[in-house]
């Protein structure tokens, strides 16, 4: 078993004061996006299979998941690498794997390969994450949300590639 990947907290992305607020805003916007998209998919067999497996989309984005919020706060408080791993694993199991089925698979492109390769340079990837502008979330469209989701997904994919069967 290899050593655990360590995430260093980008100050702009998360700090003690805004971690929960950022999480809440992102969750709200992704829930709205997914809810809008799902209305067109009611008769789609893949959507029905997905819904049967994961239930309602909104249950995937665990807005009231206190453990998830607590883990994010712990991360923001520069918690141990072990806790950081718990965060990554929790994001994977409860959020990114299911959402990737909806948001990522239909829009995969060469850009994903470039992003994934960028993940090999953790400092570069953290810089990308730390420069996200959360002040204009109201203006984010589905493309923006999808791109941010993909950014997080590919980053966590790289960090966890030896830890999870993906």
Curated annotation (Swiss-Prot):
Reported induction: Expressed in the intermediate phase of the viral replicative cycle.
Keyword Cell membrane: no
Lipoprotein recorded as keyword: yes
Subcellular location: Host cytoplasm
GO cellular component: host cell cytoplasm
UniProt keyword list: Host cytoplasm, Lipoprotein, Myristate
Protein name: Protein OPG069
Organism listed in the record: Vaccinia virus (strain Western Reserve) (VACV)
Gene behind the chain: OPG069
């Amino acid at each position: 078993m290899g050593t655990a990947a360590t995430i260093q907290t980008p100050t702009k992305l998360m700090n003690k004061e805004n971690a929960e607020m950022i999480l809440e805003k992102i969750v709200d916007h992704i829930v709205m996006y997914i809810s809008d998209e799902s209305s067109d998919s009611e008769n789609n067999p893949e959507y029905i299979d997905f819904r049967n497996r994961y239930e309602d989309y909104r249950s995937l984005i665990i807005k009231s998941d206190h453990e998830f919020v607590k883990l994010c706060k712990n991360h923001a408080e520069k918690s141990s690498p072990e806790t950081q791993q718990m965060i990554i694993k929790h994001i994977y199991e409860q959020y990114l794997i299911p959402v990737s089925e909806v948001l990522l698979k239909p829009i995969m492109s060469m850009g994903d390969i470039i992003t994934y390769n960028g993940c090999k340079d953790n400092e570069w990837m953290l810089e990308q994450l730390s420069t996200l502008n959360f002040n204009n979330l109201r203006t984010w469209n589905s493309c923006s949300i999808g791109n941010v989701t993909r950014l997080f997904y590919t980053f966590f994919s790289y960090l966890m590639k030896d830890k999870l069967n993906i």
